Curated annotation (Swiss-Prot):
Ubiquitous, with highest expression in testis and ovary. The keyword Lipid biosynthesis applies. Changing Q259A: No effect on PI4KB- and TBC1D22B-binding. The lineage of its organism: Eukaryota, Metazoa, Chordata, Craniata, Vertebrata. Its main location: Golgi. This is Golgi resident protein GCP60. Changing Q286A: No effect on PI4KB- and TBC1D22B-binding. Residues 54-69 have a biased composition (Low complexity).
Length: 528
């Protein structure tokens, strides 16, 4: 504490607070004594002035404490700050604005300093406070004002400090309001920042969950794809193994004939022979699988038809049907004559059937016919140029005609081979085997009209004559059904193992074409 005493001004600085008397109370005024008035005797505890500017006595005991708490709540509701925070604002305003924004009186400054001491150090205690000199007027005034507060609590002192400062300067309310706005703005920003962080955290958690979900879905998709790929690979290996087994079985049956055919096509060229053999084996396998699928489809259709006809399953079959049922299923007979002749009178045909069985043997004794092998090759131009050198190997099939090339089996042969091609258009082709012992081994060509003409001729004769005529015809088995072949694009070839002695019938069917004749380049030969 520092004190300055002169004729014009008296100032006291306590803890950063400057106290100076009002001009009208300066010691240099006219008639005023040069020395300060003597200090009054100390009043007993509790007999000092109250904390208010009007000198009201404080409320004793618990009533005073309760009143201070209630006053603190009212201040907080009014100013928007807690008591501690509001007192801090008031103290800072007093230190910053004293002598600038407002000019409190000498007594008001003494009271404000005393209240600040009461808040900071508690009630005045003469035993702990140092003595003040007799001539220290301001020190004595300050101590007297502090002692007058008595046992005022810290909260009451802060309340009185705020209320007194508000009475001294009307700018204090504006100062607090600006800080309140700033506080609210900071609180708003804090809440916005917390909300932003909360949203960012939620968004981050959501993205993490989505990423985890996508990762799990991707892992599941990869797992399913891997399982599917493994299953497909296993299926491919199984089919490949099955294919190798089937091809090995088929190749063991056709090795000799394919080798002979390749040797004839490329004599002395082993590499080309092996390439051709592999092509023939692959085509033979594809043809075998196609026939196998057709047989399975036919079996399924037959089973379905059998289920549909279960209502008539109890009807008895004719004797002729029972005989025909014993024929092996892999022998597809197209001997329509034999079928027609069984549908006729049974008594009338018994002697002829017995005679046929004595001469040719029973039908069931016929050997099983092996499946044919068929393939194609693209060298159609070279093939036709080679065939044109032999005029007998080029035949013309007129429009609506069917040309049959009869090729008897050879005593020294085991397999029959055929090759054919056309110029610009396709043609029907099929192979049949006629069970007849022909003494002539020469190849012959027979031209006939459409097969419909033969059927019309058979319809014009009686049943008895037709039965006799059909009975005299030899048995006929279908080796390759007649289908239209794209032989104008590539060479069609095939082979078949002799089922026995007989005649092969190679049919070139142009009955469907009413306007064009077809030139056929063909070649047939046998191998052992």
């Amino acid at each position: 504490m520092a004190a300055v005493l002169n004729a014009e001004r008296l100032e006291v600085s306590v803890d950063g607070l400057t106290l100076s008397p009002d001009p009208e109370e300066r010691p240099g005024a006219e008639g005023a004594p040069l020395l300060p008035p003597p200090l009054p005797p100390p009043s007993p505890p509790g007999s000092g002035r109250g904390p208010g500017a009007s000198g009201e006595q404080p409320e004793p005991g618990e009533a005073a404490a309760g009143g201070a708490a209630e006053e603190a709540r009212r201040l907080e509701q009014r100013w928007g700050f807690g008591l501690e925070e509001l007192y801090g604002l008031a103290l800072r305003f007093f230190k910053e604005k004293d002598g600038k924004a407002f000019h409190p009186t000498y007594e008001e400054k003494l009271k404000l300093v005393a209240l600040h001491k009461q808040v900071l150090m508690g009630p005045y205690n003469p035993d702990t406070c140092p003595e003040v000199g007799f001539f220290d007027v301001l020190g004595n005034d300050r101590r007297r004002e502090w002692a007058a507060l008595g046992n005022m609590s810290k909260e009451d002192a802060m309340v009185e400090f705020v209320k007194l400062l508000n009475r001294c300067c009307h700018l204090f309310s504006t100062y607090v309001a600006s800080h309140k706005i700033e506080k609210e703005e900071q609180e708003k920003k804090r809440k916005e920042e917390e909300e932003r962080r909360r949203r960012e955290e939620e968004e981050r958690e959501r993205l993490q969950k989505e990423e985890e979900k996508r990762r799990r879905e991707e892992e599941e998709r990869l797992r399913r794809e891997e399982e599917e790929r493994r299953r497909i690979e296993e299926e491919r290996l199984r089919l490949e193994q099955q294919k190798q087994q089937i091809m090995a079985a088929l190749n063991s049956q056709t090795a000799v004939q394919f080798q002979q055919y390749a040797a004839q096509q490329y004599p002395g060229n082993y590499e080309q022979q092996q390439i051709l053999i592999r092509q023939l084996q692959e085509q033979h396998y594809q043809q075998y699988m196609q026939q196998l699928y057709q047989v399975q489809l036919a079996q399924q259709q037959a089973a379905l038809q059998k289920q549909q006809e279960v209502v008539v399953a109890g009807s008895s079959l004719p004797t002729s049907s029972k005989v025909n049922a014993t024929v092996p299923s892999n022998m597809m007979s197209v001997n329509g004559q034999a079928k027609t002749h069984t549908d006729s009178s049974e008594k009338e045909l018994e002697p002829e059937a017995a005679e046929e069985a004595l001469e040719n043997g029973p039908k069931e004794s016929l050997p099983v016919i092996a499946a044919p092998s068929m393939w194609t090759r693209p060298q159609i131009k070279d093939f036709k140029e080679k065939i044109q050198q032999d005029a007998d190997s080029v035949i013309t099939v007129g429009r609506g005609e069917v040309v049959t090339v009869r090729v008897p089996t050879h005593e020294e042969g085991s397999y029959l081979f055929w090759e054919f091609a056309t110029d610009n258009y396709d043609i029907g082709f099929g192979v049949y085997f006629e069970w007849t012992d022909s003494p002539n081994t020469a190849v012959s060509v027979h031209v006939s009209e459409s097969s419909d003409d033969d059927e019309e001729e058979e319809e014009n004769i009686g049943c008895e004559e037709k039965a006799k005529k059909n009975a005299n015809k030899p048995l006929l088995d279908e080796i390759v059904p007649v289908y239209r072949r794209d032989c104008h694009e590539e060479v069609y070839a095939g082979s078949h193992q002799y089922p026995g002695r007989g005649v092969y019938l190679l049919k070139f069917d142009n009955s469907y074409s009413l306007w064009r004749s077809k030139s056929v380049y063909y070649r047939v030969y046998y191998t052992r």
